[in-house]
Amino acid sequence: MPKTGLDALLRPESSILVLIDHQPYQFANLHSHEPTMIVNNVIGLAKTAKVFNVPTILTTVIEERGGYLIKGLQDVFPEQKPINRTFINTWQDERVVDAVKKSGRKQLVLAALWSEICLAMPAIQALAEGYDVFIVTDASGGVTAEAHDMAVRRMVAAGAIPVTWLAVAGEWQRDWAREKTAAGLAGVLAEHGGASGVAFAWEMQLLAAQRSRPPS
């Protein structure tokens, strides 16, 4: 994958998203980030993928003990049953790998709990198999800040590209003239974009007011 230039950016038609182990057990020992932030961000990321019709794979690990996928995330794809694994490394589960290969897409976008294990393992393995791996660092987290940081450094050294969920959204949209997705993304940003979402909603309000103002 080129490191610079337009082709280095994410494209919705080339992307596939895999969301790994956003479950109660993992959240219980998440200490690198505020858990509510990760919940917000991963749901925002999932909704963004849905706006752009980016195939999304949901997967859990031993949900009988670790709990089901968090409800807000499952609600984005109510018809999809998460792939429940025994493998710690998602990329060793043939069902996940087969689904990715079947999509034909090479930009692999990953988010997981925890970063040092369930994000790092599949990221490093998929890189060796020729995928362009993008790790969504603010929709992932580790058991400590150091664990998350060391995991990100390790994956970057291996060739992964660190991104935030808003960066993913921006690269998929690229141009606000793309009306097919602009309105849907605007709704996601207003709900999950934090201060950026508030500012965006305010901008939309001002634009609407200008359009409705009678000519002088």
Each model region followed by its residue ranges:
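Active-site acidic carboxylates
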Residues: 1-87, 149-156, 160-162, 173-216
